[in-house]
Amino acid sequence: MRFDFSNLCTLRDTLGQLMERYEENENAFRQFYDAVAEKTLCPHSIGPIRIYNGSDAVLEYIRWFYATTPSVSLDDCTDALYLRLEDKISCSYGEQIDLPTICHVLTIVDDLFSFSQKLHPISISIIDAEMDGRNGESIAVFGDDSCSGAIFLYRMWNDFGGRFTPATVLLHELGHQLHFHLTGALRRLPESFYAFLRQLGADDTNASDADMLELFADTFLLAVIHKTKEFGDPFPEISEKIKEHCYSYIRNILPTE
């Protein structure tokens, strides 16, 4: 059976056919996994950051799904992949980031913070599909004193009234990768962040853990847009003084020298 990796929508349909044939061919999932594993990808690289597009982005998505999905078997993991795509993925004409924009964003954050020189290896995949509930997504895996991360940038699901652009979504996701790097965990933030919020007079007592993770990512975004508005400003209601504090905080935890 040929597998179509051109985008996540066709992959969803391909996996649907695979499900129908499973009773006839119990090796079908293994054949799919082998087809994914044997492909050689050709990313655009900027230091430790690799950027994937087209079918390479789809294959990178699948590989990360297998790597980060707890499963007792290959079949269960493939089944979970299909269910996720069936439930969340749709074809869309929403706005999408492109390679030149990603490269430009990375140039800006490198100029500000030497970002790519300081962080772990990160793959960035441009996904030609809409993910329900998400404009982008970040994940990482951790080893002994090591980290490897991935960002998936979908077609825009919601720009929140024109506030967000694909570039600011990328900046937000880079903020998540920063906290992965600093803490070595997906859901733990550096203690310095809570002290920073107290200095600003912010009350986080009723904020959920998930809210705090998003707030940290937005703090990185605010730090960048304090220095440049060319990507837009999703938070015009936040003063430049607060944005300057965000910039100083990020600069301190990720020094330029």
What function would you assign to each model-found segment?
Residues 1:
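Surface-exposed receptor/substrate recognition regions of extracellular proteins
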Residues 4-16, 30-34, 42-106, 115-257:
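Active-site-flanking segments in enzyme catalytic domains
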Residues 23-24:
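Charged, low-complexity interaction regions
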